[in-house]
């Protein structure tokens, strides 16, 4: 099972965050995270007025509780920070945590700030969420489609079909993944 670390920008919109976490719940991949990542996510989500500070803190607390096994403690990567290459100190934290967390893929919309050749020396590939999810769907179609079905079945406000959920992911920016998932679901009972 692949270990992945996501940049903060992958954790919203919530449909994309939910998918990344659900893939971990169903053991399709392991989402590795750090306290720094969640703190940055809270700051951004509150600044963008998508959640209140207490609501964002509650979501982070739930991630800490339910995904505790995939946390990379600061002490495991702080010694790597000075070695990381990149213009943004927050991104250097993410790169160092990814290296210490032995991830295979660092997923980000901001490919320019994560030097692929540098991270490859540590065995880490950099991919955007659409490319990563397409690759995962190609390698594990039954599992990924199962996650989408389970997620849709759990949606209550508003209720969603699997196709509705795929549409939300399409609007979240993972258009190639959404198209591929829709094609695979075509003709199936969703």
Regions found by a protein language model. Name each.
Residues 1-18:
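Metal-dependent nucleic-acid phosphoesterase active-site entry motif
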Residues 10-11, 79-90, 112-115:
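Acidic, metal-coordinating catalytic cores used for nucleic-acid/nucleotide bond scission
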Residues 14-49:
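PIN/NYN-family metal-dependent endoribonuclease catalytic core
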Residues 16, 90-91:
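Amphipathic coiled-coil/heptad-repeat helices and related helical stalk/stem segments
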Residues 35-73:
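Short, surface-exposed acidic-centric catalytic microdomains
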Residues 68-84:
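Short, basic, glycine/proline-bearing loop/turn elements
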Residues 91-125:
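Acidic, metal-binding active-site segment of PIN/NYN-like and related structure-specific nucleases
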Residues 112-190:
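Acidic, PIN/NYN-like endoribonuclease modules and their adjacent C-terminal/linker elements
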């Amino acid at each position: 099972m692949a270990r992945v670390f996501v940049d903060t920008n992958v954790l919203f919109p919530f449909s994309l965050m939910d998918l990344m976490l659900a893939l971990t719940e169903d053991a399709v991949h392991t989402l590795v995270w750090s306290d720094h990542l969640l703190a940055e996510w809270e700051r951004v989500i509150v600044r963008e007025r998508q959640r209140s500070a207490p609501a964002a803190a509650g979501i982070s607390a739930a991630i800490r509780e339910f995904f505790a096994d995939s946390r990379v403690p600061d002490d495991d990567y702080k010694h790597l920070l000075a070695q990381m290459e990149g213009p943004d100190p927050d991104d250097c934290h993410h790169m160092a945590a990814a290296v210490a967390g032995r991830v295979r893929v660092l997923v980000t919309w901001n490919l320019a700030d994560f030097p692929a050749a540098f991270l490859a020396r540590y065995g880490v590939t950099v991919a955007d969420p659409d490319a990563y999810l397409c690759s995962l769907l190609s390698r594990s179609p039954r599992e990924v489609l199962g996650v989408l079905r389970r997620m849709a079945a759990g949606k209550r406000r508003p209720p969603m079909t699997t196709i509705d959920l795929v549409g939300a992911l399409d609007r979240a920016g993972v258009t190639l993944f959404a198209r591929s998932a829709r094609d695979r679901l075509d003709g199936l009972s969703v």
